[in-house]
Amino acid sequence: MSMVRSFFDGLTNVLSGAGTSVDKRVHARYGLNIVDQHQVEASYRTSWLARKIVDMPAHDMTREWRDWKADGELIGKIEAEEKRLCLRERVTQAIVLGRLGGGAIYLGIKGDDPSQPLAVEHIRPGQLSYIAVFSRWQLTIGQEVSDPEDALFGGPDYFQITSIANKVGVRIHPSRMVIFKGAHVMRGIGSQWEDAFWGDPIYQAVGDAIRNADSAQNSFASLIDEATYDVIGIPGLMERLSQPGGDAQLSKRLDAARQGKSNHRAIILDSGEGGKDAETWVTRQVTWAGMPELMAAFLQTVAGASDIPYTRLLGTSATGMSATGEGDKNDYLSSIATKQETMLRPNMVRIDAVMLRSAGIKDELWFDWSPLFEMGEKERAALDKLKADTAKVWGDSGLVPIDALAKGAQNLLTEDGTYPGLDEELKKAEAIVAPDADVAPVVANPDDLGLTSEAKPKPLLKIVGDAAPRPLYVNRPLLNAAEFIAWAKAQGFKTTTPADDLHVTILYSKTPVDWMKMGTDGWGSDAKGNLDVAPGGARIVEPLGDKGAVVLLFTSSSLSWRHEEMVRNGASHDFDEYQSHVTISYDASDVDLSKVEPYRGVLKFGPEVFTEIVEDWKPTGGEA
């Protein structure tokens, strides 16, 4: 019976020898050369490239730190506790040690036996005394816990400190240690349990690439000393050397040539007889063609092996047409964000469970990692505008209570540092004594406002003080009426609205509403309830309505938000849309409005005045 053999053309090719015994590649094998503690330390301390590969991701993981989802007071307490413990610095150090082969953070609990399990639920305020960082080589670990039902499964049953004076031999329960591991090690034939627990140093997989790059750089540096060299030709050199005293004569000749070059900046050579048998001296230069590209190739290999972009690792700009490096940077930061979630967050959750209780805070709070992407001024401004627009949309929708939304927006502005000092100013604003709960937010008498006589609102509307549902008209009197009228006169208005009637309308609601539900103004008012509209911005003078009014239109987000807040609380607005304005005059037929320059100064408004609507109201005579 004949034997039939099948040959497959692919990875194995008997004609070309690929994949067969004559192919050199089939004899290649990976060897496991364990990088020991001394090599790790030597690499980290002597190679700038090795150090950056370890430090850079660790610092990037903690660079922007985290944002707590809590109110400003709680966030302040948490940040104070973090600073006391130097938490951010300790975590960064532990990540570095983890990348060097393993690190750990010890939670130092005051008055506790470190060898006993940590009862997190029994932590009292102030009990977390300190946190300490150890490398794997400062700790001895016990036996592996192999029971899958044990909470310590896969880890040691104890740790022992081996490098602290007066504490040698102290055993620590694993619940008091937070482990920062190196690269994952697969449990196999060639791996020890301790190595599998701590993980590999980063250098175990990247070491060859780093050594090749360092070697290429050192070799290139050595060649610099030989950048130029001299080629000297001496006729009959070998014959002279074979004669007695030939060596001395050659040395003497070369010394004379060097001395002439040094003293006279000239080389004296024997030109021979008729140019025959003449000495020669030629300076040549080493060609560096391809050397920079070769070194760059080694460094690119290191960048790929370490998962750090070439431009980030070396601090260089991207090369190539239209290259910005943004794609590489975004990919890198995305990988850092992944490490934060999968590697760092579980450890932070364990630390926070103890730290928050020690700070007297419930451990139900949670956090997000702060964005890693660094934005320019334009990008930041665009993002801030987007956040503001989003807050406005949620406020307009009525799905989120306005007070809760305002508090969240204030926390956001405080945390991202958009407005320095905002936190203190908000505390001052909150410290202002609010009116009693049983007092309606209604001004019963204009004299109580403390306004000047010309700024008091004209008593054309009936002022009331009870809280029964009724139509509502809300306005703010213009305090700097004299300045405003002087501007109007200068623009050609013969008569203007009387000073005591100049105001801005906030709400005109024919729908009866509970005035108590309108709340108190918190949109930009100062301690006295006054509101200033800053100079400039969009301002227009044009007719408005069917009663001959000419008004100054202006924009104010504080007035708009306050109007929308009242509408959300049940009021109506019986006009097409809300537009803040001050009525200049009801008699301006002889004024060419196209030539009027709008009022650009500050508009100072007094506190809100709540009144009922007067249905048959008509404009009165103007101020001459």
Curated annotation (Swiss-Prot):
Assigned keywords, A-Z: Hydrolase
Q: Residues that bind 3',3'-cUAMP, according to the entry?
A: Y106, W617
Query: Is Electron transport a UniProt keyword of this protein?
Result: no
Q: Where on this chain does 3',3'-cGAMP bind?
A: Y106, W617
Q: Which InterPro entries match?
A: Acb1-like_C, Acb1-like_N, Phage-assoc_HI1409
Q: Which domain of life is it from?
A: Bacteria
Q: Which Pfam families match?
A: Acb1 (PF23474), Phage_portal_3 (PF06381)
Q: Which catalytic reaction applies to this protein?
A: 3',3'-cUAMP + H2O = U[3'-5']pAp[3'] + H(+); 3',3',3'-c-tri-AMP + H2O = A[3'-5']pA[3'-5']pAp[3'] + H(+); 3',3',3'-cAAG + H2O = G[3'-5']pA[3'-5']pAp[3'] + H(+); 3',3',3'-cAAG + H2O = A[3'-5']pG[3'-5']pAp[3'] + H(+)
Q: Where is the active site?
A: H503, T505, H581, T583
* GO MF assignments: hydrolase activity
Q: Which family does it belong to?
A: Belongs to the anti-CBASS protein Acb1 family.
Q: What else is known?
A: This homolog of an antiviral immune evasion nuclease may be due to cryptic prophages, or it may play a role in regulating the endogenous antiviral defense system based on cyclic nucleotides.
Its function, per the record, reads: Counteracts or regulates the endogenous CBASS antiviral defense system. Phosphodiesterase that enables metal-independent hydrolysis of the host cyclic di- and trinucleotide CBASS signals such as 3'3'-cGAMP, 3'3'cUA, and 3'3'3'-cAAA.
NCBIfam families in alphabetical order: phge_rel_HI1409 (TIGR01555)
What is the protein name stated in its UniProt record?
Anti-CBASS protein Acb1
Organism per entry: Sphingomonas paeninsulae
